[in-house]
């Protein structure tokens, strides 16, 4: 127990050192005063004499060193295991500021000793379930580099990047620095990219949507892209991000589809409409409601883009399509029709005006008048930190999300394909030895990667800040888009380049940083598993689908997970954890009704066609 610390201090809490091993257990709760390391010497003299600790009569140090020992006799050629556990409970977590918001786990356990009492008896079960997950995943047919990228980045969900409030809401930094969190508020335009949380922990993903729509959103529909804490403060401020806000609408659709939870959708539908309608505010992102974002659009590049561009444009198209589908489900016919009209207008306009024959570009407008600026004119008329004619690595991020959500193409299919080819052509660099980067270096020397932006048609004098960098979350987004376009070889080249950089020798293989270690966007790597397997699941329609390519595919929908084994004319769907509602299984272009309407852990069904 922390006796010398105020009970409201973040350092106040409990730690327990315990063992589950059998044998002669001994301990001491204090040590000799630690002058010139005498405490360690005193411990060693005690322990080395006979392997048994002797309790001291009273603590003699303000910082006493406790010790725990287990004594066993090991026979020749035999093996013995000694198991020790360190448990803790520190309830006074700070949020993004000095305010104490608390920890969810502290509501589940009174102190560190109760953690030990309740968790240690479950360790065998937890280890078995964890190993089942890992072994099943590793036994799938995905390329080794994809399995590594997807699995290793799950470490972010067990890092200090994320935490849960006492209410159960999952919150996240963008990443973490060595001693503090980086970029607070479950930043929407960063967390938009990751796919691990919704497809592995659907309930937690729903809590993030609850924060975004019901705490961080103001009455006029402005969603703060960084939610302050405590949650009662989340809507303070006026910081909206066009990509973050539109992406949250798509995520709401995704969570509804994966869960099939109509109550969840009904509860949030009013807020979804409000959040989308904010884009139609006079002089806002799409103030004239023509399906095109001409206004000032703050985004994940930490700047404002002025004028129509593919990054925000396709997020907007995806939000319109997602809102249309949710509106039909809520029997909101007029809103559904409006979303469809704006989608068709906006999609057609971007294909006609932003697609330059190779990729989609940014048409810059005057920040004051919203009038288009002559891009061939003087640079001094062009606002700083824009994209312009650059080829952006994640210009199709909205399409990335749309594919995963099953919302179809947001633009001309041929244009989308050509754009992915151009991103590989212009942004992939096989050797960075001669590359100049005025910002942070996440790649160097002879390493390879996808540039944030390339400029085959001429660079702006002052482009957006990160244009010369390479960041893995964006690379995964592009690679997944390539997979959906049938460019699997190119996609694997990009993913392999990432993992070659994070190989455990040059960099930490379990932490792919941007602004901080264990960066949330790197969990976009999980989407490569979804794309390669052709996986899509709708709990609303009770249908799951996979590619027709023979193989063994790990799948997860956020509430259950298992394997699907596909061969010529036959597929076996197996649930290893959770419960799956299923009525139809689609393999390639073939859809077959299942005999069972529900599969629980340990059950499977084989279909033939």
What are these regions (language model features)?
Residues 1-76, 592:
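Trp/Gly-enriched beta-strand surface patches
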Residues 349-392:
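Short, surface-exposed recognition loops and adjoining beta-strand edges that mediate ligand/DNA contacts
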